[in-house]
């Protein structure tokens, strides 16, 4: 995203916040933030989406000593999974969570879920596999890497987008390929 904005003589500033806060900041009309990323596409009136900017393999982190066995998504209902509050997963999984058929524990971050899985407090956690690999390289989480693995089956390969506030300004930034002057806005 940074390179695309620079090619268009625009300045992109990226700040990092907990997921729920990032979404709230991007949705607020008075905020300095016009959007957030990465996001999976979902139906909403609050945001509009860029063209896909990448792919995120959505899977499950589990303990090596207690792998989760499943063939169909509904098979996961036998397990308690960690999810991150306000994350969009897949339509099918989110329906199971909303209906109560999928036991879950919500956390505020993927890092919290990784720690819960490693401690055996939950059976697994739904996570973007690229995020998992990045987090397990962080010094404070490296000791957990030997206990954990990615489940053999992915939930989905999801396209990633930038979500822009659904306003005239948001549409202008989404359509940044038509630059007319230098702007500076922020993404979370």
Where are these regions (language model features)?
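Short helices/loops that flank or line small-molecule/ion binding pockets
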Residues: 20-32, 48, 111-133, 138
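Ligand-binding cleft/hinge of the Venus flytrap
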Residues: 1-9, 50-52, 75-77, 86-108, ...
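Periplasmic-binding protein-like
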Residues: 8, 56-58, 142-178, 180-188
């Amino acid at each position: 995203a940074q390179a695309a904005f620079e090619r268009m003589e625009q300045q992109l500033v990226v700040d990092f916040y907990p997921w729920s806060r990032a979404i709230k900041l991007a949705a607020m009309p008075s905020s300095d933030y016009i959007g957030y990323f990465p996001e999976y596409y979902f139906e909403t009136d609050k945001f509009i989406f860029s063209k896909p900017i990448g792919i995120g393999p959505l899977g499950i982190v589990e303990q090596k000593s207690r792998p989760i066995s499943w063939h169909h998504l509904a098979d996961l209902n036998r397990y308690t999974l960690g999810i991150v509050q306000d994350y969009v997963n897949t339509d099918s999984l989110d329906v199971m969570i909303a209906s109560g058929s999928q036991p879950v524990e919500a956390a505020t971050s993927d890092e919290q879920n990784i720690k819960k899985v490693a401690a055996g407090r939950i059976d697994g956690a739904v996570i973007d596999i690229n995020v998992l690999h990045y987090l397990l390289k962080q010094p404070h989480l490296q000791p957990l890497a030997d206990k954990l693995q990615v489940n053999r089956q992915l939930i989905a390969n999801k396209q990633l987008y930038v979500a822009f506030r659904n306003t005239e300004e948001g549409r202008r930034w989404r359509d940044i390929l038509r630059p007319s002057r230098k702007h500076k806005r922020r993404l979370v």
